[in-house]
Amino acid sequence: MICIFQQSLLTIIFMEIIYTSHLEFRLRVRNIPYDLPREIFGQSKEHYYDNLTRHHIAIQKMEFEGKLRELALTYDRDENMIEMITIHPIKPHQKNSRISSGRWERI
């Protein structure tokens, strides 16, 4: 479960978090701490909708492999559930390209 605070309405929403098997595999392969996707989702001030994949993306700068990097968390959500799909480092030019092309829309 995750607690989401909506700043504008002072509303608290509890949502179930599901890690896909693909995300769990990526966490193991990339040596990423298990709770990092939850941290990214909860702390990120950058959330996008990907018009190509139809998934949501959360971007957060975190320490990864000894460096400060932006990590992209791909997820789907509905009224009471967040399904976290994958996580990976993203380079600034990749993020900027997806935003400027209109592929990613800020939400």
Language-model features: locations:
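Ribonuclease/tRNase effector modules and their secretory precursors
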Residues: 1-107
